[in-house]
Structures are given as structure tokens and as C-alpha cells.
Amino acid sequence: MYKRQCLFNAIGYVFFRSLAKAKELRKVVHDAVLSDPDTFSEAALGKPPKEYAEWVLRPNSWGGQVELFVLSTHLRKQIAAYDVQTGRVDIYGEDRFPRSERGHLIYDGLHYDALVFAYPGLEDVSDTHVTVVDCSLEPISKINGFDRKARALAKKDQERRLFTDVANFSLRCLVCQTGLVGENEAREHAKTTGHTNFGEY
């Protein structure tokens, strides 16, 4: 499985309990980008929409804010993303789908994971591992309870420095051994040299 499938695998697991949805979810993003050039302009995407749409179909292309927005819209559900490094929480679809299900992800700077809440003894739930909360049915205290647990986990991971600061981390090109700082230098090095194998040190 490709490392850069994490966002798609996390969304697939949260909403479908499947790790086999990445290709399908990538196609959803591809189609959305091509169908709405006003929303998904080159300025918003960082590259021309057609190029971005083709790029996102590749299994080694990562997902981020654009994909979370598109998938929230497509699924008509909320997606809460908890950023370990900053403590920020972005809830995609909260304003558009306030009475929908909400799935939870945690992000460490490089990797998205599904958040699964274990609630043994829940009534009328055969599986006690909960991946979504239904914002239309659940009391606000339960919704807030999920949020508190997710924030607490992100805070704990932050205190343990279980995140990668992609703007400032030290990398070495494993092809030519050049030292680099941050994702931007690595991207520029890859563009000018064709080298794409990096290691953090």
C-alpha cells in the first residue's frame, strides 16, 4: 500500500470501514476539480486544475485541505481534522451539513489517521468502536465528548512531539547527500535535480 494514501484510507475507514476506497475517493476529487474551475482555480490548487486532477489520481500523491473539502461535500458529511503540531481543528462541512455525521481524523504534519472511539457498553451499537458521531441525533454533550477526546489525544501527541514540522524539519537528499530544510527546499531540490528520495535527520 502506498504511504501517501493515508488521507484517503482514513476517510474510507471512518465512513465506510474500508481501507480499499482510496482509488474511488481520488476519482471523486479528480472529477470535482475538473467540474468546478471557479472554486478549484490554479491559485487555489497551486497548479492548473487539469494537472492537479491528473496528479491526485496517482497513488503516490498525498491529500490535504482540497481533498477534505471535496470529500466532505461529496459525502455530505462533516470531517474534523485535528492538527497535532498546532492544536488547530478544522471541521469541513460543519456550516454546510450541520445535521450530518461527523468523522474525525488526526494529522501529524505528514500523515492522516482515522480516529476511532472505543465505547464499550453502548446501547444499540453492535460495534463498540465508533468512527462517526451523528450530529442530528446525538446530544451536544456526546458530540463535545468526542471532540474533547480528540483534542486531548492531539495535545498528548503534541507534548510528546509526535508530529513533523514540514516547514522546518531537516532533510538529506539520499541521492546526493545535500542537506535541506523544510518541504519547500526539498520540493525545489527535486524539481531542479530530479532526486525524490529524502530522509529526515
Where do the model's predicted regions map?
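Generic detector of short, aliphatic-rich beta-strand segments that form the cores of beta-sheets
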Residues: M1-Y2, A114-F117, F198
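Deubiquitinase catalytic domains
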Residues: V66-N168, V181
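Papain-like cysteine protease catalytic cores
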Residues: K3-R4, A10-G93
